[in-house]
């Protein structure tokens, strides 16, 4: 309702994806299609959910007919004037994010405003929010920072130019950080408008399926309420992000991506420690391990269902020919500090700027070339 209430002069298509729901969502979509000629929807029948990583792209490519689209969450209330701000700031090769006004569900940050006008639709204080927001608009209409997060508005052509979200992360988690990196590498400028906002309520879905709770004092708490499904998928997606980019998700205080260089790294593991194999495999292009053929195949068999990357090409025997441009050799001794060095390797290599061989803790590092490959990741 908030989109229709507050869209102003703009003609807005609302495009919704139903991901194998069993709660009557599709019946509601059909009702809305009959009532609203600009309400459109697609249904994924399942039985397994494919997630918004896949369905956002189908909405953009198959359903939306406008040149400008916006990734928008169902738990957001569109504030008055938000679309005017997007119209004013969106230009070729830009993405505009609306500022989130949030109840205290998540850690505060400089890129959002924390104000509690309700955590669930049933307790939403709409009139109070709109009255408070008049002063915000008055003082922040021209304020803008760099950063990107939902909801974000973009030109469809810029989205399609990099082939949208990477299915590596399906059904969800880290797909947004991945596409933001790729947008930035492809020359997109990010703008966060503070005069255009949404109110963002409880994150309903796979992460907090049961919503938020308040204690007797009225304070909101979300800690330890994540579902097992979300925790498992988030771990898988994090490992896949590291496999692809060679580092954890990084951004500045306003959530603008920080993208270290991607190098061609091979790890040479001269022992039969399968736990170390599991920990180190995502942090390189190739790992040459001393475990026997049976243990190596066992690792591949167990881990392969968690990624679409071919692990048989990443996990190789210790004596295999080593063609990586950077080799990190590990013998029997390996500490948490050494693991930290591997996690920081892109920054260490960028700062060293030299080819050659050197020791770092218990690591022997051979640098044959410092070619970088992050721009090869722009298109998925």
Model region roles, listed by residue range:
Residues 132-156:
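A recurrent flexible, glycine/aromatic-enriched loop bordering the glycosyltransferase active site
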Residues 2-11, 279-286:
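Short, acidic, metal-binding catalytic loop of nucleotide-sugar glycosyltransferases
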Residues 147, 151-152, 158-163, 169-197, ...:
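A short, conserved alpha-helix in the catalytic core of glycosyltransferases
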Residues 45-64:
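Glycine-rich, basic loop-to-helix element that forms the pyrophosphate-binding segment
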Residues 66-77, 323-333:
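Short beta-strand-to-loop acidic/aromatic patch adjacent to the donor-nucleotide binding site
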Residues 24, 74-89, 332-346:
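Acidic donor-binding/catalytic loop of UDP-sugar-dependent glycosyltransferases
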Residues 18-27, 291-297:
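A conserved acidic beta->alpha catalytic loop
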Residues 46, 77, 81-121:
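Conserved donor NDP-sugar-binding/catalytic core segment of glycosyltransferases
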